[in-house]
Structure formats: C-alpha cells, structure tokens
From Swiss-Prot:
Enzyme class, broadest EC rank: hydrolase
Gene field: Lam81A
Binding of Mg(2+) 3, residues: 527
Residues binding Ca(2+) 6, per UniProt: 748, 750, 752, 754, 759
Notes on temperature effects: Optimum temperature is 75 degrees Celsius.
pH dependence comment: Optimum pH is 7.
EC number(s) per entry: 3.2.1.39
Protein family according to the UniProt entry: Belongs to the glycosyl hydrolase 81 family.
Lineage: Bacteria, Bacillati, Bacillota, Clostridia, Eubacteriales
Alphabetical list of Pfam families matching this protein: Dockerin_1, Glyco_hydro81C
Protein name: Glucan endo-1,3-beta-D-glucosidase
Organism: Acetivibrio thermocellus (strain ATCC 27405 / DSM 1237 / JCM 9322 / NBRC 103400 / NCIMB 10682 / NRRL B-4536 / VPI 7372)
Length: 773
C-alpha cells in the first residue's frame, strides 16, 4: 500500500458468522459501517436499527421539483422486553437479497431477517419478548389479547403482527404492545398489508411463519434465442403450520411483460411504482438480449480526411491523461478504447499503434506494484475483501465508492486489447489481473471468498449501487447508470474475447438486467414510475428513498442529463429503445438550460440525439465543439455519421451470437456482427437473415442480400490455406473464376475495388491472425 494511502475503517459491524469478504455497495450496507444503521430501503418496507430496536415503516410518497421522496418513517419499533438499549447492530448473514442482523446485550437478543421485496420481517428473540413501540396509538382492526395475530393501523398503514400459537398480547389500546411468547417458541413476524380486511390479514398469516433463511439469484443466457433468464429463490423454514411458501413483491422491471408469474390481487404503491405480489418461493424473469458491438462499423457518412485528422490529433494526446486517479485515468483509457477501432478502419497504423501501445503499457503499469511505488497500483484490502486502486478518487478508497464506474474503463481497454492480442490477455500474462478487477465489482464465483458476490449489483432491484457504505438518510444511490453499464459491456467483451463463457454470460446478465432497470427507474419509458408532481421525465440519481434531478457536483442541466448517457460506446445503443423519449429528454434539457443548444457536453447530447434524428445531430455537431473529457472529436463524428448512414437501432430482431446489432433506415435493415473467435461463424437472425462472419472480424450486411465472407474464396465458410492457393492461381490467371458466388467481393479483401497482391498479403496475415478483417 502506498505511504499515506487511505483504507476503509477497521471496524466492521458483523458477527463471527459472517465470514469471507464483506458485501458492500448494497441496500443494507449501512449496517456494516455504523454502530446501528441508517434507513434501509427493502421495498415495500423500510427499516432502521437503533439502540432501542428496529424501526419499521412503509414510506409515504411525496415531493415535487428537484426530488420525489419515499423516505423512511418510523411506524413502530420492534424492541425487546428485557433490553431497552442495545450496544450495536451487527450483520450476521447476507445472502443475495436478504440480510440477518443481530442486536445483543447480555442474555437478551433480537435477530432480524429483512428481505428485499418482502412484505414481511422476521424476528427471533432470546431472553425476552417482542415489545412493539408505535409512533402513536394504533387502531386494532383485528384481534384481542388472546389472538395469535393482530391487525393494526398506524399512520394510515396496515400491519399484521404474527405470534406463535399460545402467545398473549399486553398493552392493546396503548402505544406499546408486548407479545408474551409461550415457552419454547421465540419467533415473531410482521407484515405490511395492502388493506385492513380480515381476509387479507388471514391470507398473510398463512405465510407469516415461513421464515426466510436464504436467498439466491441464478442466471442463464440462451445464445440461440438471445434471451436471459434469471431465477430468484427464497428458502424458508416453517416455524408452525403446513404452508411452505411466502409472499414476494415484484418491482415493475420484474413483473412487466412477464408471463411466468401469477400475480395475487395484492399490490403496494412504492417509490419504484406498483409492486405486484406472488405466492411461492421462486420466480423468474426472461429478457431479450439485444447485443452489443465492440465498435460501430466503417459505414458512416463522414469526410474520411477530416476523421483521420481528428484521429491524428488524439494520437498526439494519447499519453497525456487528464489525471492519474482511477476514475479520470480510466476515462482516458475509455476514450482511446473507442478511438482505436476507428484508426484501424482508416488504415492509420501509426495512430492505432500509438493507442494500443499506451493502453497496454498503462494497464501493465497499473497491474504491477513494486517496492516503494506510490501511484498507479492496486492494493488488496483483506479486512473488507476489496481491490483499491491508488491514486483513488471520490471515496473509492475509504468508502469503497464507485469501483464499477472506475474499473469499467480499465476493463473496456483490456477487452479491446484482448480482441487484438489474445496472448496479452491470457491468464499467464495479464488476464488474471483483469479478472481480479472483474471479481472486485462483480464476483460471480461463490467459492472465491476474496471478494463478495456481485459487490456493486443489486440482483433484486436490477441495478447497481455506487456508495460503499449507504450512509445516507435516503439509502444507497447511483447517479451514472451508464457508467455501470459501461463496466458490464466491458465484461461481455472480455469474456467473448478470451473465450470465457462464464464471464461473458455474467456480463450479459448484468448488462441486460441493468438496461431494463434504467429504462424503468431512470427514464420511466413506460410512464408509470414518476409521479406527475415530480415534474421531470428523467432521474439523474436514483436512491433507495428518492429519485431526483440533481447530481453530486454543481453542474449544468446538460450534465444532469448527460451523466446517464456517458460514456457512449457501441454498447450504448440501448439508449435508443424509445426514440420519441430521446426527443422529450433532449427538449426538457434545453428548457431547463434556457438555451437553444446545450451549454456544454454538446458532443454527449448530440450523440444521444442521434439515436432519434442522426441527420439533425450531424448538422448540429461541428469540430469546434470541445469534447467532454472522456470523449473525442473522432469518436463523436464517427458515431453520428454511422447512425446517419445505418439508421436507428432495431430492437425487434435478435441474433444467435453475443456481439451484434441491427439498424433500420427507411425500413431497410442493416445487420452488424463481430466474430471474436478464431474460426468463421454462421450467424442467424430472428427475421431469417443469415450471415457468415470471418474470424476476428466485423461483417455488415444490408437488406436481404447474401453475405460474402471476404477471403473465403471457395464458399466453405472458412479462411485457410485452400483460399491462399485459390488466390494465387487467380492472380496468376490460372483460373478466371473463383468457386464462391460474387468472387470479386470475396477476393477484394481491402475493398479498394481491385484484386491484387495486396489482397494476397492481407489474406496471409488473416490466416496468421495478425490482421483483423
């Protein structure tokens, strides 16, 4: 560790049962960092640990202008009849979407189990009984001192209090109700109810004694169908009765267009919209994966001379990053990662070599720590189980903030190198270090206890969290959803480039799921999340207890919008799911700015607008615009002009390969596929289109024309020595036709309109795998 470097606090509020790396950056994380906790947003319930016990609440919704709130409020506190103040609260177990926390003093203790998406909370007591201190005197709409359960209303919210059979209640009619547990039974649960009918209370009582003991999420990518299936499972222990299930409340991104669930008639109004309930212990979601690309193709309506000039300008600045901390240095790597393919497309070998040389040497420098070195290194903190890069920024060291934002840029650069140099990316060289970065932010291997499972990603809420400690009254938060998605697309590229399907599928799970969540909770594309009183069509930040139109710095409204677009890469096409929304978002930004054009970040805004009207975006952009620090003139110009030529993303068509995109202009589709493997690949699209793509190359096909694989001179779908022999005979005029249909197109590998010795040279290099088609 560098001298003077900062690390997270030494104290972790956990019991000895919580072994291995500590989960951070989650909805429940404030338990681990604090003596008690700050509000915990499990939805539909919220909680807060304090000296007297555990506050329970169902937020009231309200707000306008800059923010809309669903803040925690204390409807009642679950306390202990024999312990009036506990010294602290400690995490005892954290599973995929639930947490057990223990409060103990002497022989008295409470263990609370809180689960994301559960209307229940479960408690186990030792040395005393449950004491419920209400924020006022509740109305009891069901039960008396001898009932097994009570139905109560407090602050307009209905709850069920569920005790073991044989229990007694004291204090009914006052603000404090104590449950006297029978001998040998130490469990107690509560549930927030959708209404105050006895039938609803009875239904919830049926599952109130099925205590959740574990939760798990599993995912599966079907390459043939281009679908992602995610299965959520809660294990339960039945304390009494014969029922073995529970009630689960699903977020809109989970129930929307989901034919695999049977919703109950019970719903909850929450900050995330309506949560629908199901009965059982498991459910699944199935999403379409719409593909990503490592870069857009060379099909733009650009002036190639101007584009090449922009590339040369950037090449001169390649070794001059804005700063050397993990975030800003990472953004510089991201800028070069997007420019590298453009240099290749232009045949600008000098710029290409300069970009890739700097990217390699920089990553190797960061991945190597020497005695006495003070900067550009990573340190593993074994107390928390995390990899910290130094120099750090924005609390990435002491608070473990934003690791997925920072490291995503490093991963993107590594993936771009891996697509070109598999040897560099091998585990014997630099690949193992790249995978450590992946594991820090999204460890998929439950057996690797050096890092927590999916640190930054919330499997149930479907998106990432940025704060390591979640130490805010509004819970955890995430501002730049697009930087999270940048990390996930980089994981897809890395997995595909290195042939590691486990890592690739991890990336597809994270990317696809977060895109769904962003469309719901940041953009409200379906118009059923944001309250009309909020007054905006977009959330700059999403918190556990609010969504808002503000950012972490004193930025312009262009920045407030653009922070959820950047970095724009060939995996950012998801932003174009609803072109009309893009127009609305852009126009709202201009109204807020009070200008006819964005005051700054013009390149980001025009790249975004190009997903609605690329021709207009092309007219708005000009080379005098100062790029955002993670962007370049070359990439902005290339992006806008490609969309001007290709059209908008077409999400109605999928393919049986992970690296693809489909575009549509004037009802004519263009299909783009990248094949990262070392052999030719046949790709079938859901509309029947078939393409054959050469190894380590990108192919583009428009309309229904048959796709010709450059270099495949005999039409067998492969590029090998047979094609070399055919090319030689063709050039020597020993044959006048090649076996493949459209022989000139197949033989003209550099697409200069001629078939000559240059094409032969390229073909040989392709076979030797040192030239990308």
């Amino acid at each position: 560790m560098p001298p003077g470097a900062k690390v997270p606090q030494a104290e972790i509020y956990k019991t000895s049962n919580l072994q291995g790396a500590v989960p951070t950056n989650s909805w429940e994380s404030s338990i681990l960092w604090n003596q008690y906790s700050l509000p915990i947003y499990a939805h539909p319930l919220t909680f807060k640990f304090k000296a007297e016990g555990i506050e329970v609440g169902k937020p009231a919704l309200g707000g306008s202008g800059i923010a809309y709130f669903g803040a925690h409020k204390n409807d009642f506190t679950v306390g202990h009849s024999s312990v009036y103040t506990f010294p602290d609260a400690r995490a005892d177990k954290i599973s995929d979407f639930a947490v057990d926390a223990v409060m103990a003093s002497g022989s008295g203790s409470i263990k609370a189990t809180l689960m994301k998406g559960s209307p229940y909370a479960y408690f186990v007591f030792t040395g005393g009984n449950p004491r419920i201190d209400f924020s006022g005197t509740p109305t009891v709409f069901y039960g008396d001192s001898g009932s097994q359960c009570l139905g109560v209303t407090i602050n307009g919210v209905n709850y069920g209090l569920f005790a073991p059979s044989g229990s007694k209640w004291q204090g009914i009619g006052t603000g404090t109700i104590t449950c006297i547990l029978p001998a040998g039974k130490n469990y107690f649960s509560i549930a927030v109810l959708p209404d105050n009918t006895v039938s609803t209370l009875t239904y919830y009582k049926d599952y109130a004694y099925c205590f959740v003991t574990d939760t798990k999420v599993e995912w599966s990518y079907n390459e043939t169908e281009s679908t992602l299936t995610t299965t959520f499972t809660a294990e339960v222990s039945v304390k009494e009765g014969t029922n073995k299930g529970t009630i689960l409340a699903l977020y809109p991104h989970q129930w929307r267009n989901n034919p695999h669930i049977l919703p109950l008639p019970y719903t909850y109004s929450t900050l995330r919209g309506i949560m629908k309930t199901i009965q059982g212990t498991s459910f699944k979601t199935v999403y379409r994966y719409h593909g990503i690309l490592p870069n857009l193709p060379d099909k733009g309506t650009y002036d190639r001379e101007a584009l090449n000039r922009y590339i040369n300008e950037l090449a001169l600045q390649a070794d001059a990053p804005v700063a050397v901390d993990t975030y800003w240095f990472g953004k510089h790597l991201g800028k070069l990662s997007c420019a590298l393919p453009i240099a290749e497309q232009l045949g600008n070998i000098s710029a290409k070599d300069r970009f890739i040389s700097f990217m390699k040497s920089s990553l190797e420098d960061w991945f190597t720590a020497k005695e006495g070195e003070t900067a550009k290194l990573f340190y593993y903190d074994s107390n928390w189980g995390t990899l910290i890069g130094y120099p750090s920024s924005y609390g990435s060291d002491e608070e473990l903030n934003d690791h997925h934002f920072h490291y995503g840029y490093f991963l993107h650069a590594a993936a771009q190198i891996a697509l070109r140099d598999p040897q560099w990316a091998s585990r014997d060289n630099w690949g193992a270090m790249v995978e450590l970065l992946i594991k820090d932010i999204a460890n998929w291997d439950r057996n690797d206890t050096r890092f927590p499972f999916l640190r930054n990603f919330d499997p149930y809420e479907g998106h990432s969290w940025a704060s390591g400690h979640a130490g805010f009254a509004d819970g955890n938060n995430q501002e730049s959803s697009s930087e999270a998605i940048n990390a996930w697309q980089a994981i897809i590229l890395w997995g595909e480039a290195t042939g590691n399907k486990t890592i690739r599928d991890l990336g597809i799970y994270l990317y696809t799921t977060e895109v769904e969540a962003v469309c719901n909770y940041w953009f409200d594309l379906y118009k059923d999340i944001f309250s009309p009183s909020y007054g905006h069509n977009y959330a700059s930040m999403v918190w556990g207890g609010k969504y808002c139109h503000e950012i972490w710095w004193n930025g312009t409204n262009s920045e407030k919008h653009g922070i959820n677009f950047l970095p724009i890469t060939a995996a950012s096409l998801y932003l174009g799911k609803d072109p009309n929304y893009i127009k609305q978002n852009y126009e709202e930004m201009l109204r807020e700015c009070g200008t006819s054009q964005p005051p700054n970040w013009k390149d980001i805004q025009y790249m975004y607008y190009a997903l609605y009207d690329p021709a207009a975006a092309k007219n708005m952009w000009n080379e005098s615009i100062v790029p955002e620090d993670g962007e370049s003139k070359a990439h902005t110009y290339h992006w806008i002009c490609n969309l001007d030529s290709l059209g908008l993303p077409d999400f109605s068509v999928t393919a049986d390969t992970p690296l693809y995109s489909v575009f549509n202009k004037n009802n004519i589709r263009t299909y783009v596929v990248y094949n990262a493997s070392s052999s030719a690949k046949k790709v079938t699209f859901s509309d029947g289109k078939v393409m054959t793509v050469g190894p380590h190359s990108m192919a583009v096909s428009t309309g229904s024309e048959s796709e010709v694989l450059a270099g495949d001179l005999n039409g067998d779908g492969k590029i090998n020595s047979t094609d070399i022999s055919l090319m030689k005979r063709y050039l020597l005029k020993q044959i006048v036709d090649l076996p493949v249909e459209d022989d000139i197109k197949a033989a003209d590998i550099n697409k200069d309109g001629k078939v000559n010795s240059t094409d032969m040279s390229i073909l040989k290099r392709v076979i030797l795998r040192n030239y990308p088609l």
